[in-house]
Amino acid sequence: MSNKLTFQEIILTLQQYWNDQGCMLMQAYDNEKGAGTMSPYTFLRAIGPEPWNAAYVEPSRRPADGRYGENPNRLYQHHQFQVVMKPSPSNIQELYLQSLERLGIDPLEHDIRFVEDNWENPSTGSAGLGWEVWLDGMEITQFTYFQQVGGLATSPVTAEVTYGLERLASYIQEVDSVYDIEWAPGVKYGEIFLQPEYEHSKYSFEVSNQDMLLENFETFEKEAERALAQGLVHPAYDYVLKCSHTFNLLDARGAVSVTERAGYIARIRHLARSVAKTFVAERKKLGFPLLDDASRVALLAED
């Protein structure tokens, strides 16, 4: 490709494009999480009747995927560009393809395929109809219409577009290793992230204190429940995220059996569902303030 955008130029281009489509530009949420979907800007805002259009970069940590910086495409932490639009625009796939054009990828000159891959996140009680988007044989995006989030049916339906920024940048810059991606002029991805990749992998697989992590999970779970009992949705959800990341560290360390693993996931799911239900109830008390007046009156009148 002739237009070899840097990593940060890819982000800037996507931000400008989705801003032009009416999305608010949010910032990465300051808690560890395994995917951009787990940000409250997606998880919480995808439920309930209020409209929501947002785009943001989300660093996503997956301890079990760490490879000490030795694998060119497998990472402890990668970056997602997350777009959520609710209600889903009827032309969302067309908007997505136009975003690729902004990045210098002409859909007419490349093999772009939507491969069915329905999505599910057992830890949060979430699922949806989905597709992987393949560009010349490489997955670059996950496309999902949420049907359920936090155990609640979504109405209206939220569309989520999740770009894998490292894969996208590798393709645009024509490099085989993520560590060779140019983040900014003269600065390679590896110069920023290779050492953290090694250290986090070593910590996740060899060094982490299992007893401490087990104790932390119990503490975070109790604190989430305590916050929820006071109607404090956002602090409670922060602790759900902490539970999730702590479990992922335990899983990477091999500290939980297959049976225990299912139990931990069920506990996180129970918390996530409680948070989701409480969030909608709290928004209802506020009169669903993001709805227009006519929709609000009609919705509240139904009750």
From Swiss-Prot:
Catalytically driven reaction(s): tRNA(Gly) + glycine + ATP = glycyl-tRNA(Gly) + AMP + diphosphate
UniProt cross-references to CDD domains, sorted A to Z: GlyRS_alpha_core
Gene3D superfamilies: Bira Bifunctional Protein, Domain 2, Class II aaRS and biotin synthetases, domain 2
Coiled-coil ranges per UniProt: none
InterPro entries per record: aa-tRNA-synth_II/BPL/LPL (IPR045864), Gly-tRNA-synth_heterodimer (IPR006194), Gly-tRNA_ligase_asu (IPR002310)
Keyword annotations of the record: Aminoacyl-tRNA synthetase, ATP-binding, Cytoplasm, Ligase, Nucleotide-binding, Protein biosynthesis
BP terms from Gene Ontology: glycyl-tRNA aminoacylation
Main location per the UniProt record: cytoplasm
Pfam family, one: tRNA-synt_2e
An annotated GO cellular component: cytosol
Annotated localization: Cytoplasm
Superkingdom: Bacteria
GO MF terms, alphabetically ordered: ATP binding; catalytic activity, acting on a protein; glycine-tRNA ligase activity; transferase activity
Family to which the UniProt record says this protein belongs: Belongs to the class-II aminoacyl-tRNA synthetase family.
Protein name: Glycine--tRNA ligase alpha subunit
Organism: Streptococcus equi subsp. zooepidemicus (strain MGCS10565)
